[in-house]
Amino acid sequence: MSTKDTNDVKPTSSKSNEISSSGTATPKKTSSVPAKEDRKDTTKKDIANERTSSSKSKDDSEKYVELKNKLIQQILKKQELTRKLTTLEDSIYQKEIDYFEESPLGNIVKGFENFSKTSGGGGANKRKIVYSEDDHIFSLSSVNYIKSLMKRQGHTSNGGSSKDDFDDYEDSVDPTTASAGSKANSIEKNETPSGSSGTPSRKRKARVLED
């Protein structure tokens, strides 16, 4: 055999190794393990995502605390205004009582019929002047007073029973979360009357005057 014929002969050992004893070809196995560079890039992305999520959670927590403190201050302010309003309404109610008692001969609410009877024959001309809640015309101009009057009569603004009246629920704050917690508690005590269901403690007896 010449040198040329020897060079033309191709090795077939590798191909024969891929053929099994049964005569079927065995497929080549490919590696599924990612390269080191790919694993490194994936790790960096995971770390970046974790940092972004942690930063967002921290911002949300700070915003929640800020809104909570702001709400506490607003509730305390509302309670203080409610206390002042209740004190003012009590003062108006008492002034109406004083006016009724100081005008036995008549007033702008009941009229002035007794003026014509002052020179008459004594007891025959006397009559009793009875005042009711409807005579408190100034107090009736207050929305809060009307609500308290409806509650005393067994009615509520939403048409349901007294237990369904959600206006009775007072705003409150946890004293441990606010520096003014003790102040809030004192305000709630002033707003809550004794022996009544959320209404100011006022005298409700009918007043009788004689001329």
From Swiss-Prot:
As for subcellular location, the record says:
Nucleus
What are the Polar residues biased-composition ranges?
Answer: 9-33, 174-185
Q: Name one GO biological process term.
A: chromatin remodeling
Q: Which Pfam family is one of this chain's hits?
A: NuA4
- Biased composition, class Basic residues, residue ranges: 201-211
Record key words, sorted: Chromatin regulator, Coiled coil, DNA damage, DNA repair, Nucleus, Transcription, Transcription regulation
Which GO cellular component terms are attached? NuA4 histone acetyltransferase complex; nucleus
Q: Write out the biased-composition intervals (Basic and acidic residues).
A: 35-49
From what superkingdom does this record's organism come? Eukaryota
Q: Where are the transmembrane segments?
A: none
User: Which residue spans adopt a coiled-coil conformation according to this UniProt entry?
Assistant: 61-90
Record bears the keyword Transcription regulation? yes
Its main localization is: nucleus
Q: Do you know which InterPro entries this protein is assigned to?
A: Eaf6
**Chain intervals for the UniProt region annotation (Disordered):** 1-64, 152-211
- Family as reported in the entry's similarity comment: Belongs to the EAF6 family.
User: What is the annotated role of this protein in its UniProt record?
Assistant: Component of the NuA4 histone acetyltransferase complex which is involved in transcriptional activation of selected genes principally by acetylation of nucleosomal histone H4 and H2A. The NuA4 complex is also involved in DNA repair.
Q: Its quaternary structure?
A: Component of the NuA4 histone acetyltransferase complex.
- Its name, as the record gives it, is Chromatin modification-related protein EAF6
Task: Give the source species.
Answer: Candida albicans (strain SC5314 / ATCC MYA-2876)
Source gene? EAF6
